[in-house]
Amino acid sequence: MANFEIKHEVTNYEDPNDWRLYFQWGTYHYENGDSEDGFRFIWRYPEGNLQAARGQARIPSKQDLFELLALASKEGWF
């Protein structure tokens, strides 16, 4: 198991009352005390909570993927 500390995140979903896909960069903190920086995609429920899905997040389209990567690149962290 690992906990994820979010350092940066972007979404291209503007409706706050709908599910939103996020691209995040942060640090994975493992139970044994090790840490690693990395990227992940994750969904948020309409109420804002993260959906933990055993390491998998469905990316609906290539357009979503490219938009999220472009947004993160524009912010300078990808």
Positions of PLM-derived features:
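A short, structured beta-strand/loop element
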Residues: 20-56
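Residues in flexible loops and secondary-structure boundaries
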Residues: 12-14, 31, 49, 67
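Short, Lys/Arg-enriched charge-dense amphipathic segments
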Residues: 3, 35, 42-43, 76-78
